Amino acid sequence: MATMDFSKGHGTQNDFVVLPDLDVRVDLEPARVSALCDRQRGLGADGILRVARAGALADAGVLGALPDGVAAEDWFMDYRNSDGSIAEMCGNGVRVFAHYLKASGLESKDEFVVGSRAGARPVVVHGYDATHGDVTVAMGPIKDLGTSSATIDGRVFAGVGIDVGNPHLACVDEHVTAEVLSALDLSVSPGFDPGFFPHGVNIEIVTPIHDGGVHMRVHERGVGETRSCGTGTVAAAAAALKFDGRDEGSVLVRVLGGEVQVTVEGGEGSLRGPSVLVANGTISDAWWQSLV
């Protein structure tokens, strides 16, 4: 093929290159993914969302087996971090993925399942057009992994390990205000306990709940600081509720890229927020092949 189609989108400024690859012909070798996501030599993105049916990915050997609850006919979000590593789940990515399916005409229903390596994620597309979408994602179980800590700017932040399909360390600190949060240096990877998180961890620094909301910044494994992290907002909301002495509730989570609404109920989380599709185009196959 001479070119590859792509779309560029973001969920609260957590941005992605969307690659429709229904026949699973594109080789997402890490060096290629890294180049495509590079903001100087590629398109620039926090990650790549490959669009294909789960069964097609399994047949091609991309998936060893279908994850829990995912059927062969389900659309599957094959997510790659900007360094080329594979991630189990991305909440902002699912919103953009679902919006793309609707806007491109690949999906006709407003409620459907998106498969991920963390399992099936039911979505509801409340409204959309070619540019803007409003999507809720059922994020699945929220698992408390126990307490740990992160070191940022020479300061130790106590936090709770939370699994939302991928590992997080959400640190709620009573001394952290929005102003203190904005001054933190997240350009350097935070320190964490590799024995507690042997596969790395996404780290959130979170303010306590005030007027129903929190502020959050996040350092994502394999990426660095991003302007938003969907699973991170769920982890942050769950940790903030726990800090507030509650197991359930709704929290408005404010990130650098905007706001999302997280609801925690019955040990599971849901995430509602915007999606924006900003561009469509083609990638030169000659450039792509030169990356090998």
Curated annotation (Swiss-Prot):
One of its GO terms (cellular component) is cytosol. Pfam families: DAP_epimerase (PF01678). Substrate binds at N14, N81, G91, N92, N166, N202, E220, R221, G230, T231. The record marks H168, E220 as: Could be important to modulate the pK values of the two catalytic cysteine residues. It is found in: Cytoplasm. GO terms for molecular function: diaminopimelate epimerase activity. Its EC number is 5.1.1.7. Keywords: Amino-acid biosynthesis, Cytoplasm, Isomerase, Lysine biosynthesis. PROSITE patterns: DAP_EPIMERASE. It is an enzyme of class 5 (isomerase). It catalyses: (2S,6S)-2,6-diaminopimelate = meso-2,6-diaminopimelate. One of its GO terms (biological process) is lysine biosynthetic process via diaminopimelate. It comes from the Bacteria. Gene3D superfamilies: Diaminopimelate Epimerase, Chain A, domain 1. Pathway: Amino-acid biosynthesis; L-lysine biosynthesis via DAP pathway; DL-2,6-diaminopimelate from LL-2,6-diaminopimelate: step 1/1. The active site is at C90 (proton donor), C229 (proton acceptor). Catalyzes the stereoinversion of LL-2,6-diaminopimelate (L,L-DAP) to meso-diaminopimelate (meso-DAP), a precursor of L-lysine and an essential component of the bacterial peptidoglycan. Homodimer. HAMAP family: DAP_epimerase. Belongs to the diaminopimelate epimerase family. This is Diaminopimelate epimerase. It comes from Rhodococcus erythropolis (strain PR4 / NBRC 100887). The gene is dapF.
